Structure formats: structure tokens, C-alpha cells
């Protein structure tokens, strides 16, 4: 049985997930819609990027690789962003597994969502026509002794540099350009995201 519960902590939304009933040789079998789409190698990355959601996405990526290491996986992204460490666990797994991971932005891909969108397989990263993409530098907040604040500030700068290096690699932009363009919230339309190199094309319809 395929499982894909990205929002199990939100019971009202969970209660409204549609079910799909299929006829099999052994009778009827029902799936929630996300589990049924997982059978088609489709993963949904929606909402805030946090540890619980990231663990589920990573588990699905590893499972689909074990099922067929030679068939592409698609991740549909609609996310405002979230925790860098959670997002990096997804990103590193996308790069680690053998199947190409195609990314598709529907709605929005902001902050870490945009980073994961750009991290898809080259030539297989897409936006839907009305999607919005936003890149910026990592955010951080810490309270404590001055020496501890300094340590955390240095760590944020290291993370910022790592993210910028990876964005430069995936987009083909110069490092200086990435540093300038991520200094503040930088929103892009689907066309602008293509021109920037965050995605490879716009999907208006299948076929």
C-alpha cells in the first residue's frame, strides 16, 4: 500500500482528502488521492517546509527509487518555503538517488521551495503559467549571549554561501549575480523564472 500523508497534523484538511476506488482482480481497492498519485511516481511538496514534511518526502523518494531506479520521479511544489535544514535533506536526496527528479511549480515556490524547484534534473524543471517564484537569502533569529549570537551569525553566512553556490550551479548565473538578486525578496513570474534559469520551461497543457 502506497502512503503519502504530507499534512497528517492538520486533521480538517486530512478529512477532506478525496478517495479513489479501483477495481482489481481481488475486488475493489481504495486509495487516498495522494497515495494513488504516488503509484504514478508523483510526489506533492505543499505548505511549509519543515522536518515532518521533509521526512515524508525523503521517504517517498527513496521508496520510488527502490521500486524503479530508472524511471523519473515528479515533484509538484506549492510552498512558501521553510526551514533550510529540512529543505536541504530533500535537496540532497534528490541529488543522491538514481532517478531523475522533475520539479513542477504550481501556485508558488518561494525561498526553500524555489531552491528545491531549481534543484530538479536539468531540462525537467517547469512552472505552470500563473506560478510565482521567489528567491532570497536565508532568515535567522537567535537570542542569547553575544558570543553565541556571533556563532549563529557566522553559521547563517555559511549557509547563505552554500545556497548561493548551488543556485549558481543550477541556474548558470554568476555567483555575484545570485548574491545581488537574493539580497532581498526577489519575486519572478513564470517567464522570468525561465529566463533566470530557475526552471527550463512553462507547462500550459499536457502533450
Swiss-Prot record:
It is an enzyme of class 3 (hydrolase). Its main location: cytoplasm. The active site is at residues 111, 136. It comes from the Bacteria. One of its GO terms (biological process) is protein quality control for misfolded or incompletely synthesized proteins. It is found in: Cytoplasm. Keywords: Cytoplasm, Hydrolase, Protease, Serine protease. Its EC number is 3.4.21.92. It catalyses: Hydrolysis of proteins to small peptides in the presence of ATP and magnesium. alpha-casein is the usual test substrate. In the absence of ATP, only oligopeptides shorter than five residues are hydrolyzed (such as succinyl-Leu-Tyr-|-NHMec, and Leu-Tyr-Leu-|-Tyr-Trp, in which cleavage of the -Tyr-|-Leu- and -Tyr-|-Trp bonds also occurs). One of its GO terms (molecular function) is ATPase binding. The keyword Hydrolase applies. Pfam families: CLP_protease. Cleaves peptides in various proteins in a process that requires ATP hydrolysis. Has a chymotrypsin-like activity. Plays a major role in the degradation of misfolded proteins. Fourteen ClpP subunits assemble into 2 heptameric rings which stack back to back to give a disk-like structure with a central cavity, resembling the structure of eukaryotic proteasomes. Belongs to the peptidase S14 family. This is ATP-dependent Clp protease proteolytic subunit. The lineage of its organism: Bacteria, Pseudomonadati, Pseudomonadota, Gammaproteobacteria, Aeromonadales.
Amino acid at each position: 500500500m502506497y502512503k503519502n500523508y504530507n499534512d497528517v497534523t492538520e486533521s480538517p484538511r486530512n478529512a477532506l482528502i478525496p478517495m479513489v476506488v479501483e477495481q482489481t482482480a481481488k475486488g475493489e481497492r481504495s486509495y487516498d488521492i495522494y497515495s494513488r498519485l504516488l503509484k504514478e511516481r508523483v510526489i506533492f511538496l505543499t505548505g511549509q517546509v519543515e522536518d515532518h514534511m521533509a521526512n515524508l518526502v525523503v521517504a517517498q523518494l527513496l521508496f520510488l527509487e527502490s521500486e524503479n531506479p530508472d524511471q523519473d520521479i515528479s515533484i509538484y511544489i506549492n510552498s512558501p518555503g521553510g526551514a533550510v535544514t529540512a529543505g536541504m535533506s530533500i535537496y540532497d536526496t534528490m541529488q543522491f538517488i538514481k532517478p531523475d527528479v522533475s520539479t513542477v511549480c504550481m501556485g508558488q515556490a518561494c525561498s526553500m521551495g524555489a531552491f528545491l524547484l531549481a534543484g530538479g534534473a536539468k531540462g525537467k524543471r517547469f512552472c505552470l503559467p500563473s506560478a510565482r517564484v521567489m528567491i532570497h537569502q536565508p532568515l535567522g533569529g537567535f537570542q542569547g549571549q553575544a558570543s553565541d549570537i556571533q556563532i549563529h551569525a557566522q553559521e547563517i553566512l555559511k549557509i547563505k554561501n552554500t545556497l548561493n553556490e548551488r543556485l549558481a550551479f543550477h541556474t548558470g548565473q554568476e555567483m555575484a549575480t545570485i548574491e545581488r538578486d537574493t539580497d532581498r525578496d526577489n519575486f519572478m513570474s513564470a517567464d522570468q523564472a525561465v529566463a533566470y534559469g530557475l526552471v527550463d520551461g512553462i507547462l500550459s497543457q499536457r502533450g
